[in-house]
């Protein structure tokens, strides 16, 4: 996005004869009234005074935002320490989030949740991720698990699992990806064979977030090897004992190893191995085999909206850090925010973040209205992820050499931002979804 400097053709000294090939009166009028250096300077000054623009939230969502903004702010400094030490987020912090209702935010009240919409999910995810992406991502696994069970579970499964997920008693994790299966889930090979009243699972999974601490795995497996592609896949609600630091994977038939990562720490990433791992047959999601991919697809819209919100939070964190540093850092007798190349970056970061935030809200409102929103969700995720990376890169540039030092939180925000273009649907997949839907619409 705004990683490149903005230069208009006339600023390069091109003659009007050249400009005339692509300019007309309407375009010239827009340029004349559009963004210029004084506008960028004024916007940066407004930001420095704490004015970030109206977000359009109603009173309830403003209260939700303020609550989680305070919570994230209280843990921001500690979070950088967790990142540097590659520590798990403390369990007492997770319990505090549970007490605030994060894990049951969108679960219906009839199943023990708060019954709020995806717009509330966006607000909470953004504010927590603004403090630390790990905090904003703790709710992702609960959101995915609850969405799977709500959309595809039996009434007994809903009654058994949803209230426990909502309270944080149960910490779920999504177990989908395999070493040779990223976006192409149709080639998934982990097998689940029915033996009496159990399924025995054999295979390998990778990039599983928070796996050691999880109590419940939404486990995508192949139950029918004779059916090609997606048709033979099923989703299991696989229980396991919660691991400890000394024994992260105590379950029989299951092993795991940590994957060292640049950023997105706090929950840790794991490779998992299954060798006859037993799952109660009653925990087949929906009670019908072969529905796994359909179940999973039903979660894509919500998951991508929530990831877009996390990206907006990371981008806002980058802006906070970049602006704060630009105000504090003195060069040539004045704060570096006074220099055009700096306030220009800050102004464009703010404008782009607002754009991503509003697209995220629009997708959430579309979802809350019960309408199809894979196009909007894909757009929100694609745009917000790119803006988060751009904002982090620009904020590092504002910090200069200090931005490359690990003691400065912007170094963490940079590596956290990078994953957003990769997970929950890579940027290339999002672009393909968007293009396909646009072609369908004609």
Report the location of each language-model feature.
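A short, Trp-centered hydrophobic/proline-enriched beta-strand micro-motif
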Residues: 168-176, 220
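Flexible, small-/acidic-enriched active-site or ligand-binding loops
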Residues: 244-276
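A short core secondary-structure module
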Residues: 198, 202-252
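Alpha-helical interface subdomain recognition
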Residues: 1-130, 135, 152-153, 164-168, ...
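Short Gly/Pro-enriched turn/cap motifs at secondary-structure boundaries
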Residues: 180-183, 207-210, 225-227, 261-268
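A structural signal for short hydrophobic beta-strand segments in well-ordered beta-sheet cores
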Residues: 190-192
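Long, acidic (Asp/Glu-rich), low-complexity accessory segments flanking structured domains
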Residues: 275-294
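N-terminal glycine-rich flavin-associated loop
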Residues: 136-156, 182-185, 198
């Amino acid at each position: 996005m705004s990683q490149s400097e903005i230069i208009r053709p006339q600023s390069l000294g091109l003659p009007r004869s050249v400009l005339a090939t692509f300019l007309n009166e309407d375009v010239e009028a827009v340029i004349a009234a559009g963004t210029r250096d004084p506008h960028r300077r004024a916007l940066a000054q407004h930001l420095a005074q704490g004015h970030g623009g109206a977000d359009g939230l109603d009173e309830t969502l403003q209260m939700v935002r303020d609550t989680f903004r305070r919570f994230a702010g209280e843990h921001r400094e500690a979070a950088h320490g967790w990142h540097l030490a590659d520590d798990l987020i403390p369990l007492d912090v997770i319990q505090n989030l549970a007490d605030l209702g994060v894990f049951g935010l969108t679960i219906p009240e009839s199943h023990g949740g708060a019954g709020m919409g995806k717009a509330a999910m966006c607000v909470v995810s953004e504010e927590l991720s603004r403090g630390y992406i790990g905090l904003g991502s703790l709710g992702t696994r609960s959101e995915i698990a609850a969405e799977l069970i709500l959309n595809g579970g039996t009434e007994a499964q809903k009654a058994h699992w949803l209230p426990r997920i909502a309270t944080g008693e149960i910490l779920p994790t999504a177990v989908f990806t395999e070493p040779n299966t990223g976006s192409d889930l149709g080639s998934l090979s982990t097998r689940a064979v029915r033996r009496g009243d159990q399924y025995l699972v054999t295979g390998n999974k990778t990039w599983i977030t928070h796996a050691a601490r999880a109590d419940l795995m939404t486990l995508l497996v192949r139950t029918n090897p004779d059916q090609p592609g997606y048709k033979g896949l099923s989703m299991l609600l696989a229980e396991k004992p919660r691991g400890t630091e000394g024994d992260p994977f105590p379950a029989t038939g299951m092993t795991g190893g940590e994957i060292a990562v640049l950023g997105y720490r706090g929950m840790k990433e794991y490779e998992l191995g299954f060798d006859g791992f037993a799952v109660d047959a009653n925990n087949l999601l929906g009670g019908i085999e072969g529905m796994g991919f359909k179940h999973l697809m039903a979660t894509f819209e919500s998951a991508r909206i929530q990831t877009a919100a996390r990206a907006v939070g990371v981008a806002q964190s980058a802006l906070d850090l970049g602006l704060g540093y630009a105000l504090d850092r003195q060069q040539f007798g004045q704060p570096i925010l006074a220099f055009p190349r700096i306030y220009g970056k800050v102004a464009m970061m703010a404008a782009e973040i607002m754009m991503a935030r509003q697209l995220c809200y629009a997708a959430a409102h579309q979802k809350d209205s019960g309408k199809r929103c894979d196009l909007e969700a894909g757009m929100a995720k694609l745009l917000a992820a790119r803006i988060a990376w751009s904002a982090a890169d620009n904020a590092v540039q504002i910090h200069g050499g200090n931005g490359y030092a690990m003691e400065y939180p912007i170094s963490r925000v940079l590596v956290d931002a990078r994953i957003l273009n990769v997970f929950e649907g890579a940027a290339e997949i999002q672009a393909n979804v968007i293009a396909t839907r646009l072609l369908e619409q004609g």
